[in-house]
């Protein structure tokens, strides 16, 4: 769920999802359109695509199990939905951590109306 995703982001980046990733670029936060602005925004685009594939799941509210050790996140046991949601969140959190050096403050609170490029498909 979103609280667990926030915790994963904190593990991988040492930053809180709010405010750093909730309205970053064109895809971080609710919705998304246009082209991702940078590598961090692409992490959000891919995360949105991952969630879209989970048609019979509730990724924002379903609780899953996971653990971490030395900065490595491991998804635990659970239903197929729980495992897939956890994996979507884990991959995005790792992506944020990988791209931390190229995070740009100018894309924080980025206005949607500037996301005018044609949208990419998943």
Curated annotation (Swiss-Prot):
Subunit structure of this chain's protein: Monomer.
Main location: secreted
Post-translational modification, as annotated: Contains 7 disulfide bonds.
Entry note: cofactor: Binds 1 Ca(2+) ion.
Domain of life: Eukaryota
Protein name: Basic phospholipase A2 Ceg-N6
Cofactor(s) required for function per UniProt: Ca(2+)
A single GO BP: phospholipid metabolic process
Catalytic activity entry: a 1,2-diacyl-sn-glycero-3-phosphocholine + H2O = a 1-acyl-sn-glycero-3-phosphocholine + a fatty acid + H(+)
